[in-house]
């Protein structure tokens, strides 16, 4: 499968998906992931407009951009264009997380690793324990090779 095309910069001041997608792109992707079957632009718009005032044409434009970025598939079903995600939310999160980490590690591996440990220690000690477990497991795996 061809990977999606994400922007080359992360928006550190944004939350969740909006770190790697635009704000409206993130809302559209969330709406698509919440549908269990291919959805029309109107159906996606109806989900978004409840919480975010936006025109249908704007949603159509964003859907087309997400198709170009290989995040969505577009197909004609019963004469209507319908959209589905190319990846599950979990698959996308894993891909985007890896891309973010690869980009950040290009800055300064040692400082990034130390900062990650410090931030987890301050904000989520359980996640720090999980990171420690993952590191130990990976080191054992590498020694066996």
PLM region descriptions:
Residues 70:
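Glycine-centered, phosphate/nucleic-acid-interacting loop/turn motifs that mediate DNA/RNA or nucleotide
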Residues 21-24, 77-96:
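Short, cationic-aromatic polyanion-contact patches
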Residues 60-64:
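Short, hydrophobic-biased segments on the C-terminal half of alpha helices
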Residues 27, 31-35, 47:
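Short amphipathic alpha-helical elements of helix-turn-helix/winged-helix folds
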Residues 95-140:
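Amphipathic alpha-helical dimerization/coiled-coil segments
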Residues 38-48:
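Short acidic, hydrophobic short linear motifs in intrinsically disordered regions
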Residues 21, 33-40:
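Short capping segments at the starts of secondary-structure elements
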Residues 2-29:
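Short alpha-helical segments that sit at the start of domains
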């Amino acid at each position: 499968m061809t990977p999606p095309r994400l922007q080359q910069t992360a928006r550190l001041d944004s939350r969740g998906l909006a770190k790697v997608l635009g704000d409206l792109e993130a809302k559209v992707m969330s709406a698509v992931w919440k549908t269990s079957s291919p959805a029309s632009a109107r159906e996606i718009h109806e989900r978004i407009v409840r919480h975010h005032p936006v025109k249908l044409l704007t949603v159509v434009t964003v859907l087309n951009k997400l198709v170009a970025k290989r995040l969505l598939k577009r197909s004609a079903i019963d004469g209507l264009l319908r959209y589905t995600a190319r990846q599950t939310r979990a698959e996308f999160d894993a891909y985007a997380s890896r891309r973010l980490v690869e980009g950040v590690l290009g800055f300064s591996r040692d400082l990034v690793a130390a900062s990650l440990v410090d931030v987890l220690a301050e904000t989520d000690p359980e996640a720090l324990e999980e990171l420690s477990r993952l590191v130990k497991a990976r080191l054992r795996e590498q020694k066996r090779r």
